[in-house]
A protein has these predicted regions:
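Conserved beta-strand hairpin/beta-sheet module of binuclear metal-dependent hydrolase folds
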Residues: 1-50, 54-56, 159-171
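Metal-dependent catalytic neighborhoods of phosphoester/phosphodiester hydrolases
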Residues: 70-80, 97-98
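Divalent-metal (often Zn2+) His-rich catalytic cores of metallo-beta-lactamase-fold enzymes
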Residues: 198-251, 267-277
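C-terminal regulatory/interaction regions
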Residues: 243-333
């Protein structure tokens, strides 16, 4: 008996924001992406409704280590020390010692971090099962293929159940609220890479899944159409961010004092940092305005706010901006 069940963990009292995947087979139960620690009460209740407790789980599979996907893992280990935690090798060190992960999240979320994500605890090294991609996991009567799918994050993997035809792709497929008409890119810093992301799309589609399981939110049953639409929007958003940055750079350069207009200011120059912050702020405002208008036209204001809360348009701009600057640095070497 193999069964796949989406568990809505009701993030910040918002249904259809984060879905953990419960995988059951004979004498085995696993979760893919349990969510943040702040939603553990709901996760426990969801498990209870399916006749399970945390102590009944055998494994947790992490697509990537962002807190909305993996933040609860350390606390779950305290409740069930026998859990096996599957995670990519680039993410594993930050599961064992989440201090840098928490510091990075704090820079993005500030005082909201505890409310949004709760407490992120370390995972003991002995519980970690290190993945690279290419492995086949046996979970009871179920077998899952692991594939490395970077782009959204350098430590991102996807899990493929060929018998059921389901691909669990984390954030590689963006945000689509339960079969909705719009797919929202989620591109937070620090390591968005569209070249790698395109390769990950190919990795997913070449396996010909019947459906995609998105952490945000649940299943979608036309994988090829979803990926084609999402890829087009992802690249278009990249171009929108790039144009916004170029326009802001031109405008801020014209209105800045001469000291800020040095041809090649030092990266540590306070004046250079000030002008860069002005450019980012101006470009972000344009990006958010344009993307919000498109989103609202497709799903309406109320659902647009739900999408934006789940992915964060400001975070998406920051991730794209960082990717653009990286690409520019490579092209000028």
């Amino acid at each position: 008996m193999n069964k796949i069940t989406p568990l809505d963990v009701n993030w910040c009292n918002r249904p259809k924001s984060i879905a953990a995947a419960l995988l059951q087979s004979e004498n085995h139960a696993a979760l893919i992406d349990p969510g943040p620690e702040s939603t553990l009460t709901t996760l426990r209740e969801q498990l209870r409704q399916h006749g399970l407790s945390v102590s009944d789980l055998n494994a947790i599979l992490i697509t990537h280590i962002h807190l909305d996907h993996a933040g609860a893992t350390g606390k779950l280990i305290r409740e069930n020390p026998n859990l096996k935690i599957y995670v990519h090798s680039k993410g594993a060190p930050h599961m064992a010692d989440p201090s840098k992960l928490i510091a990075s999240a704090s820079r993005l979320w500030g005082d909201q971090l505890p409310t949004l994500f709760g407490e992120t605890l370390p995972v003991p090294q002995e519980n970690l099962q290190i993945l690279e991609g290419g492995e086949t996991l046996t979970l009871g009567q179920r077998k899952l293929e692991v594939a490395y799918t970077p782009g959204h994050a350098s430590h991102h993997v996807s899990y493929f159940d060929s018998d059921e035809g389901v691909a669990f792709i984390g954030d590689t497929g963006g945000v689509r609220i339960t079969d909705g008409p719009y797919i929202l890119p989620a591109t937070p810093p620090p390591d968005v890479d569209l070249t790698l992301w395109d390769k990950s799309f190919h990795t997913i589609l070449e396996r010909k899944p019947k459906s995609l399981f998105l952490t945000h939110f649940a299943e979608y049953n036309d994988p090829e159409a979803h990926i084609i639409e999402f890829r087009e929007r992802l690249h278009r958003w990249f171009n929108t961010a790039e144009k916004s940055l170029a326009a802001a750079t031109k405008f801020v350069g014209k209105t800045s004092p001469p000291i800020m207009q040095k041809p090649e200011p030092s990266a540590t120059d306070p004046a250079a940092k000030e002008i860069e912050a002005k450019i980012e702020t101006a470009a972000m405002a344009v990006f958010i305005r344009e993307c919000s208008a498109e989103l609202e036209s497709k799903v309406g204001p109320a659902e647009a706010e739900h999408y934006a809360f789940t992915a964060g348009l400001d975070l998406s701009f920051r991730g794209l901006s960082r990717a653009i600057r990286k690409r520019q640095e490579i092209n000028t070497r």
